[in-house]
């Protein structure tokens, strides 16, 4: 969180794509802590008049169904609370597709990043 204030103080930032959670989720950080961190970033960006798009993530069931339910609810909740555009799942259409991921099966390859970039561009075009 210390980096958020510093990073968002750079001149010329008009818009951020706010996506946080995959690594927090994989490390088992509780959804309420992830939500607080995201909300703090939203407040900092809003105070600087920076536009925001929320890039959602979904949790697998490896941490249990309660964790998944709570984690998956974070992004729509913040989008609604702050009236921000939402990409429900940033990796939609990319996750689990071997043609769109690196050999590790987790990280998008060049083709996968193009799909993600197009999704982001569509949201930007529709909202800003």
Model-derived features: positions:
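Alpha-helical cap/lid subdomain in secreted, periplasmic
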Residues: 1-128
């Amino acid at each position: 969180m210390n980096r958020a204030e510093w990073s968002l103080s750079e001149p010329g930032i008009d818009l951020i794509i706010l996506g946080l959670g995959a690594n927090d989720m994989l490390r088992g950080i509780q959804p309420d802590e992830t939500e607080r961190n995201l909300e703090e970033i939203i407040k900092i960006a809003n105070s600087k008049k920076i536009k925001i798009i929320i890039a959602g993530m979904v949790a697998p069931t490896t941490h249990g169904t309660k964790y998944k339910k709570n984690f998956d609810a974070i992004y729509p909740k913040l989008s609604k609370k702050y009236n921000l555009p939402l990409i429900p799942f940033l990796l939609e259409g990319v996750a689990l597709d071997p043609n769109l991921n690196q050999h590790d099966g987790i990280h998008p390859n060049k083709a996968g990043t193009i799909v993600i970039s197009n999704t982001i561009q569509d949201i930007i075009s529709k909202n800003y």
